[in-house]
Amino acid sequence: MRYDPNLIEKKWQQFWKEHRSFQANEDEDKVKYYVLDMFPYPSGAGLHVGHLIGYTATDIVARYKRARGFSVLHPMGWDSFGLPAEQYAIRTGTHPKVTTQKNIANFKKQLSAMGFSYDEGREFATSDPDYYHWTQKLFLFLYDQGLAYMADMAVNYCPELGTVLSNEEVENGFSIEGGYPVERKMLRQWILKITAYADKLLEGLDALDWPENVKQLQKNWIGKSEGALVTFHLTQEGSLEAFTTRLDTLLGVSFLVIAPEHPDLDSIVSEEQRDEVTAYVQESLRKSERDRISSVKTKTGVFTGNYAKHPITGNLLPVWISDYVVLGYGTGVVMGVPAHDERDREFAEMFSLPIHEVIDDNGVCIHSNYNDFCLNGLSGQEAKDYVINYLEMRSLGRAKTMYRLRDWLFSRQRYWGEPIPIIHFEDGTHRPLEDDELPLLPPNIDDYRPEGFGQGPLAKAQDWVHIYDEKTGRPGCRETYTMPQWAGSCWYYLRFCDAHNSQLPWSKEKESYWMPVDLYIGGAEHAVLHLLYSRFWHRVFYDAGLVSTPEPFKKLINQGLVLASSYRIPGKGYVSIEDVREENGTWISTCGEIVEVRQEKMSKSKLNGVDPQVLIEEYGADALRMYAMFSGPLDKNKTWSNEGVGGCRRFLNRFYDLVTSSEVQDIEDRDGLVLAHKLVFRITEHIEKMSLNTIPSSFMEFLNDFSKLPVYSKRALSMAVRVLEPIAPHISEELWVILGNPPGIDQAAWPQIDESYLVAQTVTFVVQVNGKLRGRLEVAKEAPKEEVLSLSRSVVAKYLENAQIRKEIYVPNKLVNFVL
């Protein structure tokens, strides 16, 4: 009988499908376990083996927890709204829905071939109207809570592309796509008030079993700062407020800097400086925020022609404008303290502004007394408290907590996204759609390009945009913006609890049974955006009594990157492995050019992704699953090797041959059971500790030891096969039946460990002569002293020849020493 994974795997995948083996049920008699992957965007490129690391890990845990008696929810769906499908539609005219459905079908085929134990009955895509019906409803809930509003925002606009770009899509004032000029413009946008939840989002991190680096990234992104607002009265009419956390440096202020987009800038600028300031503002608005705040850029700026009075000394401070100050941080006004801030120092040196040192090397205030303001000798919190009290007593400032976090710009000028369910009227008012008007479907259009500045592609469908609103009896216009891709992923984990409820996004009963997600695995690239946005939505739902937990994801693991060899011709780009060869240690392209070889993250753009289907056809899914774990710790970067998959296939061949051999007998063999119980103990420990990369090596060690036994216990092998199932389910199902068990290994309980099999039955004595190690002796644990001494003499007989033993030292279960 020969191991044929292609035959076996298809057979058992069909069995699982027919028997709905992995259907999740709300069983009140069982403890629940919800294990979830960050669901994928179904791209046209399909999956490569790098994607399978996390999916294999969650599947191992799901199968293990089922075997331990848990009621397990392990679903999969599709984060299917997104820019790539829309860009493809712009190029080809193919509706994004068609492209998305085709890509989903390919993804499902790839995942099914891996034998993942998903509850397929809960599958959905975020672009399904039945799903985004509820995304729209939840947006309106946020709107009703006062957390969704419209405001003018400065955005990156590319006239050539006809669309707004994110900061990540702009570099040095040009679009990354196409290299076109980008300018900053004010645009009316939908915004979510995530800042209202800044403190709760910070506090909630403490109770989460998440990687510390992810929690720190979120803390930094929220950026809570305790400080004060300091008032600087202008020499002309008005004043400016600057936020600072370094109140101890107040007497070191020698200038103020205001952001180019500050709303009060126009009233501050003198007529003599207006043209120069206007030109500078226009120039700065062509830069992305990332470029403006870069620490490596040369500081630029223009004097506004105005001065402010120092709140303590009354000294006149020049007010400058510079693009290194951004309106979204603090108040958009920075008090320049060049002696104690690197960026301020660079600016001061560029424009020859004064530098006043007011803090010594020990952090103590110096040169900081003025009349009744006495700061010298103070430091740290004591100095901070003194300054705040002084300012507040004189109405010159007040304590203030500020956040780096800004409200979430939520609208997009895209077609392939959830239409925002709002109707606008001529008088400037608007109304949210009511329940009977949802879902709001997008119109069918032929041209998916944006419709000029401030208009999304939906604006092209005039018959869809301009309507007579029967609810109010007025003409109105539908919102032409759509939601970002993040919208659908903000709450998808809740929909999996109750995936096909047509009356509610989820029922209270099912949500309270399944939530929170017990284990969430995905890439570290989502550390801030997706994970922060979903936590925000969830906390809003919790405060409103819609969910039972304050946090959605109890434990988070970020899988490491999968690296593979990439081949690049300098100055030209990447080539595939099929187009290179190695000659005397140098890699050459088929065109004869020298190729650079690097270990880089698998990606379509680098042409180094490995198609899992190719490996499945050659080695089988179980071998691929084993190597996906064996390649390295789950949370670490790892280098991929197709040869490693072959090694796991050879192990499975040996294991299959052993279980199907004639030496397998229905007997109680202690040696075999000892090995089996030790294996169960180790695999249990590996999974509980998420040390999944050590599972294959434990099985290989077991196989090596077990194969040396004179006879193979069927009971011992059944135990081994049962604990192999989480990582290699297809071969385990097959061998389970061959060993005489009923089909459906997932219905069998995890083997119970008998501690008596884990206790050693023998002990090893160190045998010494005159204190020097001369041999070792393994005997039964209960062997009497005289027997141990007699056997020990035999072990070191050559060292005892022609010698008289003067003393025999015996340490039970450890040592025998013959003193001559």
UniProtKB/Swiss-Prot annotation:
One of its GO terms (molecular function) is leucine-tRNA ligase activity. It comes from the Bacteria. Coiled coil: none annotated. ATP binds at residue 604. PROSITE patterns: AA_TRNA_LIGASE_I. It is an enzyme of class 6 (ligase). A motif ('HIGH' region) lies at residues 40-51. Keywords: Aminoacyl-tRNA synthetase, ATP-binding, Cytoplasm, Ligase, Nucleotide-binding, Protein biosynthesis. A motif ('KMSKS' region) lies at residues 601-605. One of its GO terms (biological process) is leucyl-tRNA aminoacylation. Its EC number is 6.1.1.4. Its main location: cytoplasm. It holds the Pfam family Anticodon_1. It is found in: Cytoplasm. It catalyses: tRNA(Leu) + L-leucine + ATP = L-leucyl-tRNA(Leu) + AMP + diphosphate. One of its GO terms (cellular component) is cytosol. PANTHER family: LEUCINE--TRNA LIGASE, MITOCHONDRIAL, LEUCYL-TRNA SYNTHETASE. Belongs to the class-I aminoacyl-tRNA synthetase family. This is Leucine--tRNA ligase. It comes from Chlamydia pneumoniae. The lineage of its organism: Bacteria, Pseudomonadati, Chlamydiota, Chlamydiia, Chlamydiales.
